[in-house]
């Protein structure tokens, strides 16, 4: 082992040990402490507003409107919700007590896991790190934050913000790349949250399994979008274009491919072309509202997916990491663009005759993180919801469910496990501990040895009648 590797290893252990020692003092568990830290985090996000928004532009050329709506202001809304509801979230939950356990009372206590690690992606490098951390803080944990090295300006902004407002034994940021992340994974954690790709998610899961560490994994996949013939097509096309090309398509829940009922496909394509021009002008490369691809590696991967009947866009410029909003028609399940998650500004369009063929195609693949349906027919939507599996379903819109504070945001199968958002984030970073308090009254003698046939029959009867 080199001296550099040894230094990283010692540093990582030192961070975790310091946080575990701090957690073991019990100071993080009180309501007053947690509320104070939430208010500090809110003050930090407010104070560093300009640095955060500027960093998002530097890393992704993310427009200010998008940066506020999807990263900065939405995080402040998450903090306001947590501050208002922390007291109720922390209260023990009363649950029914069956007659067999009476007299007694039953509660579920939420207790912090302890030392937590939250690893964020580069596509929403601020929101997808701080939003889960709000849950970790509310639950009473200590926190190590690992921002993405592919968004270095945002990583620095988060480091500056956290180091100014928090002590490292409570909350700290570890910057760096693969080496630093692997070194963190070699430590013993009480909980790990990861947002990113499925392959890296498997590595995180394997590392956590060594210590039986619980995890939440928010991954990705090819999120389908289905457009019924019974629909407000103008609104549907506008919302789909917005969701597909926001953040240059670099969104884990972006509508990956579009299934359009064959009778309306031509009209849908006409509206898509119109919307792209309205959003980004005749030359999206010059638009301040259209971003860039995060890295040359991702640029080349996405560029290689542009194949087939390109009817809009297709232009690329590696020097700027620019890929135009691109629409590909007459796509089939065998097309190159359908073999992996796109994570870029390419919209494949497929047509269908019956909804059963669409459901069959979706169910033949991995379970997606999101599934989108555009239809005025509740029976059409209900059939898809019932007969497919996905992390979430959004009907007649795209993306916005991710910001809903009362709905779980997370995946299933290859798209992930666990969830966050609002109270759900608090629950994700908490161990729900059952607590049963019994009375000394009515001590049933039949439970004790020596066992007799009469006692056994009594207990069999009591268990069936008084528990079930």
Residues of each region from the PLM?
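Hydrophobic packing residues within well-ordered alpha-helices of enzyme cores
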Residues: 155-158, 184, 204, 268, ...
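Conserved C-terminal structural/oligomerization subdomain of aldehyde/semialdehyde dehydrogenase
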Residues: 2-3, 21, 30, 226, ...
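N-terminal Rossmann-like NAD(P)+-binding subdomain of aldehyde/semialdehyde dehydrogenases
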Residues: 1-107
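ALDH superfamily catalytic-core signature
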Residues: 2, 6, 199-332, 355-356, ...
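Residues at or immediately preceding the N-termini of alpha-helices
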Residues: 12, 31, 49, 233, ...
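Structural signal for hydrophobic packing residues in well-ordered secondary-structure cores
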Residues: 27, 42-45, 49, 60, ...
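Rossmann-like NAD(P) dinucleotide-binding subdomain of oxidoreductase/dehydrogenase enzymes
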Residues: 99-235
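Residue-level signal for inorganic ion chemistry
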Residues: 34, 79, 140, 171, ...
């Amino acid at each position: 082992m080199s001296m550099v590797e040894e230094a990283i290893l010692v540093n990582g252990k030192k961070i975790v040990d310091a946080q575990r020692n701090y957690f073991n003092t019990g100071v993080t568990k009180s309501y007053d402490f947690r509320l104070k830290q939430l208010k500090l985090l809110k003050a930090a996000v407010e104070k560093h507003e300009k640095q955060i928004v500027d960093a998002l532009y530097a890393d992704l050329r993310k427009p200010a409107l998008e940066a506020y709506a999807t990263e900065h202001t939405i995080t402040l809304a998450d903090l306001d919700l947590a501050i208002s509801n922390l007291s109720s979230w922390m209260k023990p939950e009363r649950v029914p007590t069956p007659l067999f356990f009476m007299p007694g009372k039953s509660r579920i206590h939420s207790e912090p896991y302890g030392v937590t690690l939250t690893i964020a992606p580069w596509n929403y490098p601020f929101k997808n790190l701080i939003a889960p951390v709000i849950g970790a803080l509310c639950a009473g944990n200590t926190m190590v934050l690992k921002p993405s090295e592919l968004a270095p300006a945002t990583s620095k902004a988060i480091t500056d913000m956290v180091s100014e407002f928090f002590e490292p034994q409570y909350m700290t940021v570890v910057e760096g790349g693969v080496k630093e992340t692997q070194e963190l994974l070699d430590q013993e954690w009480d909980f790990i949250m990861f947002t990113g790709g499925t392959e890296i998610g498997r590595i995180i899961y394997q590392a956590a399994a060594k210590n039986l560490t619980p995890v939440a994994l928010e991954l990705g996949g090819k999120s389908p979008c289905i457009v019924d013939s019974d629909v407000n097509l103008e609104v549907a096309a506008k919302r789909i274009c917005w969701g597909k090309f926001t953040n240059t398509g670099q969104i884990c829940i972006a509508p990956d491919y579009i299934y359009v009922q064959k009778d309306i496909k031509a009209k849908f394509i006409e509206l898509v072309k119109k919307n792209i021009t309205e959003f980004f002008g005749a030359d999206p490369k010059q638009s301040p509202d259209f971003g860039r691809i995060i890295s040359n590696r991702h640029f080349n991967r996405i560029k290689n997916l542009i194949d087939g009947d390109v009817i809009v866009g297709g232009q690329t410029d590696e020097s700027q990491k620019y890929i135009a909003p691109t629409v590909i028609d007459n796509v089939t399940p065998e097309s190159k663009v359908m073999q992996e998650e796109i994570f870029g500004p390419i919209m494949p369009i497929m047509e269908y005759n019956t909804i059963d063929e669409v459901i069959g195609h979706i169910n033949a693949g991995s379970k997606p993180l999101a599934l989108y349906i555009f239809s005025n027919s509740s029976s059409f939507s209900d059939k898809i919801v019932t007969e497919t599996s996905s992390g979430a379903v959004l009907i007649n819109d795209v993306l916005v469910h991710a910001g809903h504070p009362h709905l779980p945001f997370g995946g299933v199968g290859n798209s992930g496990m666990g969830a966050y958002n609002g109270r759900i984030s608090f629950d994700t970073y908490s161990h729900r501990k059952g607590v049963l308090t019994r009375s000394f009254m009515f001590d049933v003698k039949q439970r004790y040895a020596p066992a007799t046939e009469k006692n056994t029959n009594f207990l069999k009867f009591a268990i069936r009648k008084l528990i079930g």
